[in-house]
């Protein structure tokens, strides 16, 4: 009984071994089984994604590469991933499968005829042939000539309407009724200018003026 109590006291005195930062931890894997895989850092890589991809913890990756923050992986071109032999074989198989998929699905190259068609189509959109340019220029000149002739004809018709004696219906109200209904005006327009004639009254008045001048 005493021996059991003494053994228990010694266990309490020793206590459990506390772990602190930097202390060594025993693992079930030997150094021969742990391998370091080299991973080329890509623009979209994250520390969490790499840990899930290779089946390791983020602390192991940071410890193997001496990283202090999660965002400092882009400071290096490549990272070392600690992995066991089974994990390394699995990652090699995944890389080989990805390579075979890329090799098995060749990129379809466009045919020569399609290239020529697309190039010809682009040239037609960007540039215009001289024949098309001249035909378009002729069309524009023809349209402008037609518009000019139409304007000239409209001006001539308007001038002839103003020069006619009757005039347009809208201008009849502006004319004086004496010019429209005077028979003397119509007679003068038909016979022409009337010669000057000396009447007897005018001759007597002139003779009377001559007598007064003599006196």
From Swiss-Prot:
InterPro entries: LYSM1-4, LysM_dom, LysM_dom_sf. Residues 86-103, 173-189 have a biased composition (Polar residues). Residues 37-81 form the LysM domain. SMART domains: LysM. It comes from the Eukaryota. Coiled coil: none annotated. This is LysM and putative peptidoglycan-binding domain-containing protein 1. The lineage of its organism: Eukaryota, Metazoa, Chordata, Craniata, Vertebrata. The gene is lysmd1.
């Amino acid at each position: 009984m005493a021996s059991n109590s003494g053994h228990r006291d010694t266990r309490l005195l020793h206590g459990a071994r506390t772990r602190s930062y930097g202390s060594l931890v025993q693992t079930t894997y030997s150094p021969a089984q742990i391998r370091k895989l080299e991973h080329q850092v890509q623009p979209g890589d994250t520390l969490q994604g790499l840990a899930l991809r290779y089946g390791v913890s983020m602390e192991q990756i940071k410890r193997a590469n001496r990283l202090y923050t999660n965002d400092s992986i882009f400071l290096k071109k490549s990272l070392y991933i600690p992995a066991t032999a089974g994990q390394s074989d699995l990652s090699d198989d995944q890389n080989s499968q990805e390579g075979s998929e890329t090799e098995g699905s060749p990129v379809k190259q466009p045919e020569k005829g399609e290239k020529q068609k697309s190039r010809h189509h682009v040239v037609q959109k960007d540039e215009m042939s001289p024949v098309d340019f001249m035909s378009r220029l002729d069309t524009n000149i023809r349209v402008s000539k037609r518009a000019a002739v139409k304007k000239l004809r409209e001006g001539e018709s308007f001038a002839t309407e103003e020069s006619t004696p009757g005039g347009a219906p809208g201008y009849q109200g502006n004319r004086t009724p004496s010019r429209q209904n005077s028979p003397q005006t119509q007679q003068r327009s038909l016979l022409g200018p009337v010669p000057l004639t000396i009447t007897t009254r005018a001759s007597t008045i002139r003779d009377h003026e001559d007598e007064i001048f003599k006196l």
